[in-house]
């Protein structure tokens, strides 16, 4: 069992912020709950320029504004989907659309910021990177590990 302190090292303020963004009935996965990322179809719901800075291993870019044009036939309904964005708000919105279409979906708790802060690997293409596009400078205050990119 992971002690509470180790499982959720993010600041109280960050956890409070996330609690205002997430719907209570939409399932989230904490990074430490993911034994094997390849067990999921990982979808990056950020904008293309954010994805190009860094992403989770083998993540498929679907975008947020662009998501309505994504071909859902590319996904396997028998394999769970993990969606993420910067903090989890955009990904929850995309995730809800996937649920409506019959997919089992989880939102990555805290988004790529929490993932990076927990020191899980990030990639630019196939190579590891420590850069994280934080969407805006305002969201960047929550990134404690890695190199912040805003543009």
Regions inferred by a protein language model and the residue ranges of each:
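Rhodanese-like catalytic fold shared by cysteine-dependent sulfurtransferases
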Residues: 1-31, 48, 52-77, 92-151
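Short, surface-exposed ligand- or partner-binding patches at beta-edge/loop junctions that are enriched
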Residues: 84
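A short acidic-Thr-Gly-centered motif at the start of a beta-strand
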Residues: 31-38
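Sequence-level motif detector for i,i+2 pairs with an aromatic at +2
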Residues: 38-40, 57
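Structural scaffold elements adjacent to functional motifs in cytosolic proteins
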Residues: 42-44
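Residue-level preference for short coil/turn positions at secondary-structure junctions
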Residues: 38, 77-78
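Hydrophobic anchor at the start of a short beta-strand
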Residues: 40, 81, 105-106
């Amino acid at each position: 069992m992971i002690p509470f302190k180790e499982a959720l090292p993010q600041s109280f303020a960050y956890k409070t912020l996330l609690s205002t963004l997430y719907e209570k009935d939409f399932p989230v996965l904490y990074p430490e709950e993911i034994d094997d990322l390849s067990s999921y179809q990982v979808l990056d719901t950020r904008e293309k320029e954010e994805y190009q800075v860094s992403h989770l291993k083998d993540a498929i870019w679907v975008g947020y504004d662009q998501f309505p044009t994504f071909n859902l036939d590319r996904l396997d309904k028998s394999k769970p989907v993990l969606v993420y964005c910067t903090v989890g708000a955009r990904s929850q919105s995309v995730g809800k659309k996937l649920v409506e279409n019959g997919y089992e979906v989880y939102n990555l708790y805290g988004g790529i910021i929490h993932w990076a802060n927990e020191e899980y690997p990030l990639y630019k293409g196939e190579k590891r990177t420590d850069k994280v596009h934080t969407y805006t400078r305002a969201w960047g205050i929550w990134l404690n590990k890695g190199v912040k990119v805003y543009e």
